[in-house]
């Protein structure tokens, strides 16, 4: 039999038999909210970079933090769903605004960095998300302690670099941060599944976990590509 004549069963590829139907419905809501966040964040970034009506700064950062705290303080229920979705959209918008300075830096160096970084982030996020969804349940939850330890190490090294001013340490933190965020995609995806299996159906808050993973991945990859492009230009000179 010719292997090229075989039909691919896409239903089997998208079948997650180890995840209950109610949790699968929950995940659909999570990823639908995630898609909404992506569109709203893109609008926020556009407002900063193009219209300059709202600029990234201390106020936008405090606004995003305030919206997140309000979202956390508002209990998940059918009555508060619309309000919490509005808070989520506001948080995503201000997060997009906060990406503005990094976007402007990349545009100044080479505008092609932006689509490359976005496509790269989308591919990384999709691959690691699918890996977590197809893997045996709880198989990546052990990463939690390792990832938090790595985050603590990065935080300490970043504080130390304020005094040393080492570009090498800064770049090492970027690469390490990229690796750590890949781990967080695995960890957060499986943690969302476990929470849903145990009755936690707050898809709006679960969406924030994945949204922040994606944004941080995008920021890290964008800056890595920007610094690499800058180094190439220096070598040509």
Curated annotation (Swiss-Prot):
Pfam (any one): Bax1-I
Tissue and organ expression note: Highly abundant in adult testis.
Stretches that traverse the bilayer: 30-50, 53-73, 87-107, 113-133, 140-160, 167-187
Covalent link Glycyl lysine isopeptide (Lys-Gly) (interchain with G-Cter in ubiquitin), residues: 7
Cellular compartments annotated: Endoplasmic reticulum membrane
UniProt KW Metal-binding keyword: no
InterPro entries named among the record's database cross-references: Bax_inhbtr1_CS, Bax_inhibitor_1-related
Record GO biological process: autophagy; cellular response to unfolded protein; endoplasmic reticulum calcium ion homeostasis; intrinsic apoptotic signaling pathway in response to endoplasmic reticulum stress; lung development; negative regulation of apoptotic process; negative regulation of apoptotic signaling pathway; negative regulation of calcium ion transport into cytosol
Keyword ATP-binding in record: no
GO molecular function per UniProt: calcium channel activity; endoribonuclease inhibitor activity; enzyme binding; ubiquitin protein ligase binding
Keywords: Apoptosis, Autophagy, Calcium, Endoplasmic reticulum, Isopeptide bond, Membrane, Transmembrane, Transmembrane helix, Ubl conjugation, Unfolded protein response
Cytoplasmic side: 1-29, 74-86, 134-139, 188-206, 228-237
Single GO cellular component term: cytoplasm
Membrane topology reported for the UniProt record: Multi-pass membrane protein
Lumenal compartment residues: 51-52, 108-112, 161-166
Similarity-based family: Belongs to the BI1 family.
Domains: entry comment: The intra-membrane loop at the C-terminus acts as a calcium pore, mediating calcium leak from the ER into the cytosol.
PANTHER family listed in its UniProt record: BAX INHIBITOR 1, BAX INHIBITOR-RELATED
Subunit structure: Interacts with BCL2 and BCL2L1. Interacts with ERN1.
UniProt function note: Endoplasmic reticulum (ER)-resident protein that confers cellular protection as an anti-apoptotic protein by limiting multiple stress-inducing pathways surrounding the endoplasmic reticulum and mitochondria. Inhibits the activities of the key sensor for the endoplasmic reticulum unfolded protein response IRE1alpha/ERN1 both directly and by blocking BAX/BAK binding. Modulates ER calcium homeostasis by acting as a calcium-leak channel. Negatively regulates autophagy and autophagosome formation, especially during periods of nutrient deprivation, and reduces cell survival during starvation.
Name of the protein described by the UniProt record: Bax inhibitor 1
Lineage per the UniProt record: Eukaryota, Metazoa, Chordata, Craniata, Vertebrata
């Amino acid at each position: 039999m010719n292997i090229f004549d075989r039909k691919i069963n896409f239903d089997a590829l998208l079948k997650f038999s180890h995840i209950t139907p109610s949790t699968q419905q929950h995940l659909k809501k999570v990823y639908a909210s995630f898609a909404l966040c992506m569109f709203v964040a893109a609008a926020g970034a556009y407002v900063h970079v193009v219209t300059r009506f709202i600029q990234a700064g201390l106020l936008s950062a405090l606004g995003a933090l305030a919206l997140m705290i309000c979202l956390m303080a508002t209990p998940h229920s059918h009555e508060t769903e619309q309000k919490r979705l509005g808070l989520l959209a506001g948080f995503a918008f201000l997060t997009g605004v906060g990406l503005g300075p990094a976007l402007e830096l990349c545009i100044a160096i080479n505008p092609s960095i932006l689509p490359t970084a976005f496509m790269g982030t989308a591919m990384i996020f999709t691959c690691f998300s699918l890996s977590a969804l197809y893997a045996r349940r709880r198989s990546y939850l052990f990463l939690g302690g390792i990832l938090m330890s790595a985050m603590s190490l990065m935080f300490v090294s970043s504080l130390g670099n304020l005094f040393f001013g080492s570009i090498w340490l800064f770049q090492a933190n970027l690469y390490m941060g990229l690796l750590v965020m890949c781990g967080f995609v695995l960890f957060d995806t499986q943690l969302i599944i476990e929470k849903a299996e145990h009755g936690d159906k707050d898809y709006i808050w679960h969406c924030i976990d994945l949204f922040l993973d994606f944004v941080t991945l995008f920021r890290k990859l964008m800056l890595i590509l920007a610094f690499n492009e800058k180094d190439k230009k220096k070598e040509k000179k």
